[in-house]
Amino acid sequence: MKMEEMDLEEDVLDVVDQEASTIVDILCEQRDNVLQRIFALVDARTREQLQHLPNNRESISGLVDYFRTSDQHTCRRFLDIIWSFCENIPLELDIRIVNLAGSTAGALVNNSHVPDTENSPQSRYGKRARLDQVQSYTNAVKSFLQKKFEKVTKDIKKEVCLNNTWLCWRTQKYARVRDRPAKSQEGEEVSLEHKESVEALLMKTGRVVMLSGQAGSGKTLLMHCLAHHWAQGSYPSIELLFLLEFRQLNLISQPLSLKELLFRFFLPSDEDDEQSEAVLNYVLSNPEKICFIFDGYDEFGARFKDPKELECSVNPYQQLPLADLLSALCSAKILPGCTVLVTCRPRDVFDLFGSSDYFVAELLGFNQQRVKEYTQEYFQEKGCEIKERAVSLLMDSHHLLSMSHVPGLCHVCCVCLDHFLTSDMSQQPGTQLPTSLTQIYLHILSAFISRCHGCGSSDNHTPLLQRYRVQIAMLSKLAMDGLENSRIVFPANELTTELMNFGANAGILSRLDLTCGDGSRRLGCAFTHLTIQEFMAALHLMTNPDITESQLKKKLNLKSRWTAKTDPKTVFTDSLHLYMCGLAAEACTSNLVLLKGSENARAIVLKRQDAVLKTLQRFVVSGRQTGPKIIELCRCAHETQNIDLARAIGPRDRFELRNIRLNPVDIDALAFVISSANQMVCLDFGACYIEPECLNIIPNCKNLEELNFRSRKYDDKFAEALSGILPKLQSLKQLHFISGGLTNIGAAKLFKASECCPQITRLNVSDNYLTDESVKKITELFPKLAKLTSVILGKNNISINGIFILAGKMAAFPNIKEVYANAKKKEINVQFSANTTNSASTDDLNNTEESKQLILNDWNLKWTNVHNLCPMLRGCSSLTVLNLSHNALGNRGLKKLLEHLPTLDTIQEINVSDNGVDMDGVVLLSPLLCTLKDLTEVEASHNGKKMLVLTFSSSIIDALKQVTSEGCDILHKKLSLTHSDIHPTDMNKLCKNLIKCPNPLNLDFSHGTLKDESTEKLLKFLPNMASLNLLNLSHIQMSTDSALLLVQLLSDCQRTTTVELRQLGETFIKFLQDKSEAATCKFNQYRLSSANLAKLCEILEHCHHLTDLDLSSNFLKDEDVKTFVQFLPKLQISGSVSLNNNNLTEVGVLYLLSLMHTCERVAAVEVSLGKEEQQDIIGFVQKNCTGKTFRLSSCTVQSQNVLFLLNKLATLNSVQTLELRNNSFSADTIKYLITEFCGDCNHRTIRIMEPWIKGEAAVGLVQCCLELNPNIKEIRVEKTCLKLSVESLVSATIPNEWENGNCSLSAVHCISFDDCEVEGQHLSSLQSALRNCPSLQELHFSQLTMGADGAEFLSSVLPSLKNLKILSLSSKGETEDEAVIFALQHAQKHLEQLSLAHHVIKDRGAAVLGNALQGFTRMRSLSLLKCLDWTATGGRDLVRGLVQCHSLEEIRLDSIELDEESIDCFAQGLQAMTSLKKISLNKTISKEGSGVLCLLASLHPLIELEEIELIGLRMGDRGVEELVKHIPKWTRLRKINLSENRVSDHAGEMLVKALSHCRALQQIHLFRNNLGHSSAAVLGQVLPSLSELTELDLSENQMESKGCSSVCEALVSMKALKKLHLTSIGTSDLVNVASCLKHCTSIEDISLSWNNCENDVVLKLAEVLPQCSKLKRLDLEANNINTSGAMALATCLQFCPWIEVIRLWRNPIKKDDLILKDKRLNFSST
């Protein structure tokens, strides 16, 4: 409004009267000094009255009323002060005041308080002019915005109602999920929201708001509507509103200032630059009155800049890049306090940097009612019939309805329906509504073209798409060009006028007035919506001939809905891939062919459609997809309508969706995929925004088994909507509504709806806001859901009263098996037994009911609560566990609980741990343990304050009761009082009560403290405690004197059988019911003095039945040992004494050695002074004991004591066995020992181990020994150990040379060097000694390299060894020692055993060996192991000699090659070897593989056969058929090994049946064949008859589960079995095998490796292994055992000390847990 147009004589009083409310609002926001100036104009009396009103607003309102009735002069002064000093005066009021001041400028009172420059007429006239310019521009803006609104809404059918269009506010920013990889799918939850109408967006000013909405949600329309409402007078707090569109701003490339942005690109000033400057100054001076709306940030080509990268304050006149300028506006770097509204899509919200200075709102779509209303409005002019039909079609089509929740798509669906109904398509047979978004857009395209003006044609038979395919192709190319270059606006010069007119008339394009970067205007166009542009681009890709298949695939990729700052900015909706998928649908083929238009159009279209489908198939198999990409994949499949593709996506048991927005279209696509897959699935929604309309689509998901909702945003309203669909989910088994906003109201509706889901087994409503009322409601649900197994209610607001409601229902509903409530952990669970009908009836409840448990922890329960709880449980049959731990019962509560025990007749355990019970409570329980028949154990700790558990007998325990000879049941009882300080008075009370116990009793006082007085009290009662079995005092701080008092029990109490005392270690005393015949005493880890030791020995003197005494680890010194040695003859010990790990030196060793003289009953002394572990054991004479033994190891004797020790040993004539290990003895010392110790010619055995005894030194030592002592009978060197035995001449066989008086000859019978680094060159020194050994019968060389020197040695000594019968030569590796073979010619002809291993024998050597064998007429055993390198000729020469050895009883020819002629010769020779008992031909075969059958046929005469090994002969079924002819005759057969022979399942049956005749069998090895379940079935029948079988190996045969079951049946009776190997047998179901092992009482070695076994097998093993007391090794390599399974094994090992190793290689086990540190659990080969 201009000044010239204003009434200059406007009355001052009228202005105040008309603007009174506005003036009051202004004055309420002013400072006190301004109000004081105004109150100064009022008379004193009135001022006082006004200032005493109740509040400031009433005072100001009265003040304004005062001036409304004052005179003109006073009123003018009032307005003058307002204009001069008040802030935030609205523009129109400011203009009126200036006008009044200007009309009477000279009449104003001289205001000394106002500066002259401001109060001057010139200043007021200048301001009036500027305000006039601002008002003029404001009016122009309002007119401009109203015209734009009319243009935007010209085709809108329905009036836009801001008060009926809703948004929801987010109270915090969205979680940027992909910025945190560690939470890639869980993400943060978006916090609570609240709804508001869109008109509220501008009601509050001064804030930055991001309004997000999906493409097509109506953001642009609503922004124009808001601007229109402002222009009409709404939002009075906003003086100026600027609406800018990002699609226009995209055209700006150069930097610009705020002024240039407003007056070049929004609305240029109609007047000169002076007006622009005035408006800008007003904007800068009044930012709180300015509003900016930036529409379509998603269409902006750049990103907002982080405000941290901008300057603190940005100059509004400074030219900046557009993104920086807009970022400065949004972050208050420019115009702080102005209102900014930015519209965008949800993914773009993250681009607005900053803190809490901006708000996020989300535009909500249509609900079903709004969809219906819009559809009715759209078809209002079409007539009632079409309108009703359109509404009916839309509401009945869940595809169309799901799309219509987006307003833009709702409009699209209406256009589609309009075309469908008005073009008579609906009347054509077989015509259906489109079922995908792409198909709808194809209909839209046809609809747009059909209504295009000027497109008419006389050709009514040509389809529209074909008729205008050229124009469509050009528009499609334009769309694709824009898509590739991120352009949505096109200048008119980029397309022809005809094409623009066609597009605009059809509604595909919209014309635009574009403002260029220089401010000039020109015509342009854009597609009516981004989705239209993307659809047209997809048409281009599918129809343009220039597009290659490679280009097509590049455009097809899955989009994630999780966004990150690093994601590239795009202006499009990322729907191109969906339209491409939709166009690949079969239903779109004909339309694409029309648009293609070429001769081979169909072939090209089909090829491109196939390429799209194949690419999608690759996406399916490309690996694990995240939730957003799963949804996108489902959308793609839904668009294709391809069932096969949907089935490929569907096979997954769980669809996890986290932190994404889901709309009805998404759920519709998900339902399409899930319903196509033939399996049950789970839908898991975590913090996803789900529109209520989505829930109505979920019932379309067939096979839905589990439904999870997890987010605070899921509240009662959501639960109400969910309740509406639950009755439709008939296959639903699990419902989880957790971590939500559910209250009793929503829960009641949810529970009510759940009644209609008969399959529900699990209901989880934890972490909500439920109270006891909901508990009551959910218990009403229990009898109505017959299959319910679990209800979870934790983390709610449920009190103990609610818990008692659940506890009370345990009696009413028999199928409740557990109620668990832990207040500290906030867990409340109810478990139900399966397959039991829920019924409140309690009639005829029998013992078949499952046991029940009630667990109430950390509820601060007191004795009064127990008084209320127990009556509730009175009728609860089968209640076995009552756990009330971690409460506040105290002794009084415990007593109250015990009073109610008679009503709990099925109870097995009561846990009242951590309940404030003290020792008085424990004492209260002790008489009950004696008097209550069913109370079997009281387990308490820390004087009852921590653990306190009562255990009662049950049916299971009753079955294990011991039965006495009189037939009476004996129920064992136990009192555990651990970690307790038991005072003497308490000990006295306990023992007085327990002495009356009639049942066998165990007492456990471990880990506590016993003072001497308490120990004395205990000892006073122990002899009279007749029922006591065990007293456990482990880990108790006890004095040595108290410990000695306990030892006194061995003499004071004749029932004492074991006393084991360890300071702070395992300590216990065992008693028998009758007098003990034998007793053991262990007194360890005490620091015993000589006085203590003497006292102990004095006590033990009176124990006449002591068998073993262990004084290990008592810090005994040499002098203490001397004292003990003096006492030992007086002690009547019959077994052993252990002095391990004390502080002995070599002096102590001599004291112990003296026992051999002083105590005749001492049979053995073993001493080891090793650094790691000291061992000192004294053994006593047992029955059948001949001679004494002395063992000494790791004792480095000083040089002056060596001779003394050796002489001492030499005098011990009774010592027969002497073992000396690692004592640093030299060769001279050993020689001296051999001379002196063995000089008396008594029978002696000496073993000496020193690290230097090897190689040449070993040979030299043997030579010296033979020369020093001719009585040596046997001498061996094995590694570094020398072993020799000496016999007297009387017992030795006297050779002829001795009879002839040659006493220098040795009587040695056996010399052996085994793996001791001896080589042939070392043996020369032995020659002379061997020539003097005429009695030598055995000569062994193992693991050595003979060489030429060794061959020479053999050639030299063999002729002199007249009595040699056994010669063994095992080479170290495969070495060529042919000279050794030649040396064999010198051996005596009466040689009986010859063993050659790893020798390389060529033809000449084979011939020599063959000739030699012909002369060995007494040969009984021949072994040629891996002796290779002869040709066929050499092999024949060898075999010809071998077959002449008719007396052979054993042949081993492993891994040698024979040709067919040699095998034939060998086979013929075998028939003559009727004495043969053992034959091993492992992997011995001709290169051609023939001759096996001939060889097997030759075995028929060998009826004495005991062992046969034929590994790797590849005999196959024909070989087995031949073999089974002979096996029944081998009745003495003990071992058979036919591994690696390609035996089939059928042949295996024959073999096993034949073996049934061999009842002496001890070993069967059949690994790596082709046996199956048929062989196993026969084996299961035969094995029980083989009672002596010790080894069975069936590894690497595909026996599978059925065959395994057959073997299991036999295992039950195999008591002698020691070794069982079932490696890789084709089944993981080995639970039955594990279960049967308990029957194999002799088992030592088990292998179940490489079977992919699960934890169930391990758990069964853990249960069985404690019964396998001889097991040493268990192999479980390469299975599927996880950490929990390994922990079960580790726990089991604590009870199985006999097990040496369990191999767990190649299993998915994390070895972090301490329990897995047991060294016997082997996880790797290192």
Swiss-Prot record:
One GO MF term on file is: ATP binding
The question of whether Cytoplasm is a record keyword is answered with yes
- Annotated ATP binding lies at 213-220
Ranges: LRR repeats: 879-902, 904-925, 1002-1025, 1026-1048, 1103-1126, 1128-1155, 1212-1235, 1351-1374, 1387-1411, 1421-1443, 1447-1468, 1502-1525, 1532-1553, 1560-1580, 1588-1609, 1616-1637, 1642-1662, 1670-1691
Where the record annotates domain NACHT, the positions are 207-537
Q: Which InterPro entries match?
A: Leu-rich_rpt, Leu-rich_rpt_Cys-con_subtyp, LRR_dom_sf, NACHT_NTPase, NLRP_HD2, P-loop_NTPase
**Which SUPFAM superfamilies does its entry note?**
P-loop containing nucleoside triphosphate hydrolases, RNI-like
List the PROSITE patterns hit by this protein, alphabetically.
NACHT
Could you tell me the Gene Ontology terms of the biological process aspect for this record? innate immune response; positive regulation of MHC class I biosynthetic process; positive regulation of MHC class II biosynthetic process; positive regulation of transcription by RNA polymerase II
* Location within or outside the cell: Cytoplasm
Keyword Plastid in annotation: no
Pfam families named among the record's database cross-references = LRR_6 (PF13516), NACHT (PF05729), NLRC4_HD2 (PF17776)
Query: Any one cellular component term from GO for this entry?
Result: cytoplasm
Q: Provide this UniProt record's keywords sorted from A to Z.
A: ATP-binding, Cytoplasm, Immunity, Innate immunity, Leucine-rich repeat, Nucleotide-binding, Repeat
What function does this protein fulfil? Probable regulator of the NF-kappa-B and type I interferon signaling pathways. May also regulate the type II interferon signaling pathway. Plays a role in homeostatic control of innate immunity and in antiviral defense mechanisms.
Regarding protein family, the annotation reads: Belongs to the NLRP family.
Annotated PANTHER family = MHC CLASS II TRANSACTIVATOR
Its protein name is: Protein NLRC5
